[in-house]
């Protein structure tokens, strides 16, 4: 199943001011939380790249994105997104290296954080390669992490900023009720 945010502008058409307004609201929260810090925002391909770019513009922050593309001659840091249709993700190592000398906080930008596992894999990879050079945070429109995942992030001092907290515990059960052979379904009941 795929939960679609009707205001995001990725899966179904939306008036640009609706999507951009939502992105501005998230940028405001990030800006207040990390006021005065120089930030590197990393938008996750493919769905969160526009969100990350919009936040970076509003915050005056550095920006890069993960990718699934392969450019010859570029060194990447590879990690996996186990639940995705295309599991391999990567970031350009040279861009992280360049940020390491002048940026302290990396903010990972997502449309929705469900388990936090993909971001956690990238955090572990960056800590392995860069030690304590960076602190990490996550900014998302939706946060569906369960209590155990949130506690893991808190224990590791990874900040969380989001617009809406969601409960995904019943999604598989609810989605199973709607077999529509790939056709658009109306929103599920609460």
Describe each PLM feature range.
Residues 1-190:
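PRPP-associated nucleotide enzymes
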